[in-house]
């Protein structure tokens, strides 16, 4: 049985305009055009730091379009090697064209730029490091200027960090742009004389990923690349506030070495190390693991002395003498001593006749000779000390036999908490409760 395809019904021109095929064919160019109008790549503005761009030409400031001096598109002369003014509909005056801006911390920024600068963003806001610090020249000493800063996306891409390659890779299209904000330097307006004598530091700028931020922080998307920009505006005498700058003249300065990737946690470990080493406020991260061997040894010895001096059970160090006639010393961090001139059988037979131990005198500080510690029952064997475990418990004969073999005990040393739950009844009562029934009973010395 043969089937014949029925002819498709003919649609009118008006109905054909609303068909699925027509909507799909017309939707592509519109979406692409909308995306281009929403996020314009700023790669041409990043290549040269000495080029100036009018503030109102970039879509990152659409929300503050009144700050601009014109809405024309940037011309091909925006890529330049000298501080020239591009041929835009509104050309700044000769006074603004003479103004030059230099990045004070360029050497530090270059170090980060080689590795790929990353900036942390948080809900509450995080300050930038390195900080944007600039100085101006060519300004009129008698005029007043307003210095601003903003951060715009470099491109319309989202990035991810490839750990196996130690590099950033494109992960897809950028997230929807966040509200653009201008950061006005709190000391503005400056006089030209002030700008010639001092640098302008944006150390109080904070970056956040909180879209509902009400503190004036700059809102950024994580895993996106951004370019900070510095703007200088000449303030007219008739300007009452910073909100009315529609007719002001300005210049914009971009430094390509300040490009960074916004992250919620550092991806490159080299960036983390460089920030800790370069940031004077990161001293808290320079722990003992970053010290030299000599410094680390002194720190560890101080920690060890502190824990020993405050330990509820006295542990003997290498400075401790185990008896008036004994010359045996201990290595630091061990509470064990063995007798080299006494056999195991004679030691067990001698120790089995010891009565129950009594409470000794209070513990003394580290380094005090054991001769000053009163012993209620003197030990019959001079020059030796029964082995004790880390908790101060006498070891079993099997443990003693294993410790007597070789050059000496090699028991590991672990730091115990100062107030363990076993010591709530007193250290010696707790030891009695922990002692095995077959353990040898010996007094403390």
From Swiss-Prot:
**Consequence of gene disruption:** Embryos die at mid-gestation. The heart tube of deficient mice does not elongate, but anterior and secondary heart field markers are not affected.
**Sorted alphabetically, which SMART domains does this protein's record hold?**
TBOX (SM00425)
| Predominant place of localization | nucleus
Q: Where is the signal peptide?
A: none
GO MF terms listed in the record are: DNA binding; DNA-binding transcription activator activity, RNA polymerase II-specific; DNA-binding transcription factor activity; DNA-binding transcription factor activity, RNA polymerase II-specific; RNA polymerase II cis-regulatory region sequence-specific DNA binding; RNA polymerase II transcription regulatory region sequence-specific DNA binding; RNA polymerase II-specific DNA-binding transcription factor binding
The UniProt annotation puts the region (Disordered) at: 318-337
Subcellular localization(s) per the UniProt record: Nucleus
Q: Which Gene3D superfamilies match?
A: Transcription factor, T-box
Q: So which tissues is this one expressed in?
A: Prominently expressed in the extraembryonic mesoderm, developing heart, eye analage and motor neurons of hindbrain and spinal cord. Expressed in extraembryonic tissues such as the amnion and allantois.
One GO term under biological process is:
motor neuron migration
Question: Among its keywords, does the record have DNA-binding?
Answer: yes
The residue ranges flagged as biased composition, category Polar residues, are 325-337
User: Which cysteines link up through disulfide bonds?
Assistant: none
Q: Which PROSITE patterns does its entry note?
A: TBOX_1 (PS01283), TBOX_2 (PS01264), TBOX_3 (PS50252)
The UniProt keyword set, sorted, is: Developmental protein, DNA-binding, Nucleus, Transcription, Transcription regulation
Q: Name one GO cellular component term.
A: cytoplasm
Residue ranges the UniProt entry marks as DNA-binding: 108-287
Q: Does the keyword rRNA-binding apply?
A: no
Job description of the protein: Acts as a transcriptional activator and repressor required for cardiac development and may have key roles in the maintenance of functional and structural phenotypes in adult heart.
Give the protein's recorded name: T-box transcription factor TBX20
Q: Say which species the protein is native to.
A: Mus musculus
* Name of encoding gene: Tbx20
